[in-house]
Amino acid sequence: MARRIEAEEELLANADLVITSTHNEIEEQYGLYNFYDPAHMTVIPPGTNLEQFHPPVDDEQIAFATQVERFLEDPKKPLILALSRPDERKNILTLIEAFGESQPLRQAANLLIIAGNRDDIRDMDSGSQSVLTNVLLLIDTYDLYGRVAIPKSHRADEVPEIYRLVAA
């Protein structure tokens, strides 16, 4: 922990600008450091760009749909979306278990899991490997083939489109 604090002190001493998401973060988190300088800190609050995130327009063709539909037996069913990095704390596995154990839910909807980007699970860090391996095992355990879509990759600029696909 001491090495981490030392490294953070060095970064603060040499940074031209530190970006935080809240003023509270500037005061409470960085205020404890020796090189605390609020003049070199700015807040960019999290938020949603409503120009990008909007309901689908009438006959809008959503390109990402082809990446999803190839997994699904009945792509016309509504989608339940989980979009996160493959991290145990994100509870992707619990979602799959709930979906797998609920026949009414499986009959009513498909599950779309966007869990980060990958080429080969074996090349990922051990935490991501574990989550994704268990995702695949649960899909197999509950025989969710044709009901779960889990594309290997997406771009950040496709996220609004993914939400429109789910809302369509």
Where would I find each of the regions flagged by the language model?
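Catalytic cores of nucleotide-sugar-dependent glycosyltransferases that transfer UDP/GDP/TDP-activated
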Residues: 1-168
